[in-house]
């Protein structure tokens, strides 16, 4: 059996259920994430954002995939909300911030996608642009919320050719999709920027030595770009699962 990869999930409210069920919500993880893990040889396990469970979940997984989703509450990086802030989910925010703390303490390999990169950055001490169009000072800001289907690329990113990301992707020029209005502002000190869009927006970050700590985050939705048109994005899942497998082996003999 492959390594167990925890995949974070979101909460969706169903008004029709609220009349008959106390919680009135259901947990959702997009299938693209779990299929991406499974195709890479991992065993995906969806992690519902239940208060008080983060530490126990961290103890049982070999890798963590932080999925995309809603905006992160800016109070986690010391700011008040701007008018352009979208919906936040307090339960999910609190759970994921605690979960990241516990998995990093244990050395669990972490892969963040879109919101996942943002959560990683904030958990490690960084900050975010709450809304790129209103806060990012660049005349050449490109559209980071595409209207095309998620599996279609909409802009290019340049990868640092000295980065481990370049080795994983086997390329320094990537075509990516874009579904976000928040982004990394001040990067957390342990991380390095390894990919940027043409407007300077951070598109990927990593821990400088992945053999020491496997921490990688990308701003694009790699889970939706694993088809034959963009096969290089599968490499991210493959590398993460491989790191999780090594973590599982070390844990077994500890």
Task: Report the location of each language-model feature.
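Glycine-rich beta-to-alpha active-site loop
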Residues: 112, 117
């Amino acid at each position: 059996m492959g390594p167990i990869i925890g995949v974070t999930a979101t909460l969706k409210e169903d008004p029709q259920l609220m009349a008959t069920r106390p919680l009135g919500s259901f947990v959702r993880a997009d299938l693209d994430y779990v299929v991406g893990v499974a195709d890479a040889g991992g065993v995906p396990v969806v992690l519902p954002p239940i208060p008080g469970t983060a530490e126990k979940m961290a103890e049982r997984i070999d890798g963590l995939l932080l999925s995309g989703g809603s905006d992160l509450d800016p109070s986690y990086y010391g700011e008040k909300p701007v008018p352009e802030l979208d919906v936040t989910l307090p339960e999910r925010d609190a759970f994921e911030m605690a979960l990241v703390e516990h998995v990093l303490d244990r050395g669990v390999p972490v892969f963040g996608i879109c919101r996942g990169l943002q959560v990683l950055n904030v958990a490690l001490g960084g900050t975010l642009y709450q809304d790129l169009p209103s806060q990012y000072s660049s005349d050449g800001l490109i559209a980071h919320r595409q209207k095309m289907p998620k599996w279609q690329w909409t802009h290019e990113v340049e990868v640092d050719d000295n980065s481990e990301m370049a080795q994983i992707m086997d390329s320094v020029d990537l075509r990516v999709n874009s579904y976000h209005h928040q982004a990394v502002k001040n990067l957390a000190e342990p991380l390095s920027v390894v990919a940027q869009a043409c407007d300077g927006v951070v598109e990927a970050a990593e821990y400088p030595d992945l053999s020491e700590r496997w921490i990688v985050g990308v701003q694009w939705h790699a889970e939706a770009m694993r088809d034959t048109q963009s096969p290089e994005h599968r490499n991210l899942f493959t590398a993460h699962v491989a790191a999780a497998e090594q973590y599982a082996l070390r844990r077994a003999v500890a």
